[in-house]
């Protein structure tokens, strides 16, 4: 099956190496379930978009991660976690 069934939040391509980066965004806390989701997207990209010289990495971005996600990511060198902060103020 070559049709992608789920939308990827952000798909980037490196300017020099042409490697792909799959970015999965989570609004609040990310758990280990997001690892499977990210790996599924990465697998699809590797199978359907990559040339033999291209690699795919993943990045999960959320405000927090739980312990389960931390343990799962320790076993993967192709997926990383990054935390974001938002400071939003309306000023009149």
Model-derived features: positions:
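Charged, terminal alpha-helix-loop-beta segments
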Residues: 1-92
């Amino acid at each position: 099956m070559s049709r992608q069934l789920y939308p990827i939040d952000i798909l980037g391509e490196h300017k020099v190496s042409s490697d792909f980066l799959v970015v999965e965004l989570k609004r609040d806390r990310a758990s280990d379930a997001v690892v499977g989701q990210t790996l599924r997207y990465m697998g699809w990209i590797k199978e359907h978009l990559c040339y033999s010289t291209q690699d795919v990495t993943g990045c999960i971005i959320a405000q927090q991660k739980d312990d389960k996600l931390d343990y799962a990511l320790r076993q993967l060198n192709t997926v990383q976690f990054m935390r974001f902060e938002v400071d939003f103020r309306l000023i009149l």
